[in-house]
Amino acid sequence: MSLLTVKNLSQTFIDKTLYEDANFVLNKEDHMGVTGQNGVGKSTLIKILTGEITQDEGEVKWQNKLHVGYLDQYAKLKAGIGIKEFLQTAFSDLFQKEKELNDLYVKYGENGDDSLLEKAGKIQTFLEEKEFYDIDTKIDRVATGLGLADLGYERDVAKLSGGQRSKLILAKLLLQNPDVLVLDEPTNYLDVNHIDWLADYLNDFEGAFIVVSHDYDFLGRITNCIIDIDFGTITRYSGDLKHALRQKEADRESYLKAYANQQRKIKKTEAYIRKNKAGSRSKSAKSREKQLAKMDILTPPQNNKKAHVVFPYVDTASNLLLQTQDLVIGYDQALVKSAFNFSVGNGEKVAVTGFNGIGKTTLLKTLLGKLKPIYGNFELSS
């Protein structure tokens, strides 16, 4: 059963065609990934599907009465409420039912009308079916999985960092448990263990979802079908990401072969026409000219652009390029309790890892001289 049908979708951005006459469907059992190079229109497609922008041409049709949940990482958060209170808003309709239930009991206490108890019983059954009394357990599961519980449930949402804020919005969306999840880069700001948890969660998700992610390892773990955007077309592949990429490469090789064969045929036909247009075979030449005019010419294949980055290298006689001594970093207060004492030698390649908010960027800014150390010092080789 198709939850979403996209027909003849066309979209341009300034003078660039993102897609032209694209077609695909999202079925009930689909865990769909969206792939393609930067700038091909993945996020634009998500905005079209969620109604944030209107497509130039074509039809985007969702099944009626479908709850589609979209990850809006820039949603506004109201100051003055804690993390848990915010997450409870995912169940606002159930809390409203609980209020109706309590009001019925109050009225029954006032007039003893048995019909009120009957209404209350129906609401009670509804709440139990919706697992209302397990809400705290559900919140704990998601908040712990995404690393929000460690921040403290009473933490004011207005005081969260950008990454923590994105986690909170994602957590609420998951708790709402929509029929379809639409996620654009959900792993942004997530640490490795949180990505692992999210992958497990999505694999167990009973609904359908569409996910855009630059993390192909994550995408490969959660998807059972792929739509790939490439040079104005949207192609759907069944199976996981590895299968889709293999099939895409096979399709590309077939296209290159077909294009080369057609070009050879065109050149051969054009040569025949030039040679025989004015001679005894002019009738045959004109016939081939008409055939050539009616030919469906294949679009020239385009090569994917590859980045070429050059980091200027300055040779140095020193074996020690960086030395820190009891270096403490932070803004108003230290981000890391222990002082840094480390060195970087000539030729070493160093990775800086750690949880979000632990101080990785702050360390780099300090070493670049953009922030002053709270304590200690460091020395760079001249």
List each model region and its residues:
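Intracellular alpha-helical coupling/juxtamembrane segments of multi-pass membrane proteins
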Residues: Q247-Y272, N276, A285-P301
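ABC ATP-binding cassette signature C-motif
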Residues: M1-Y255, K305, F311-S382
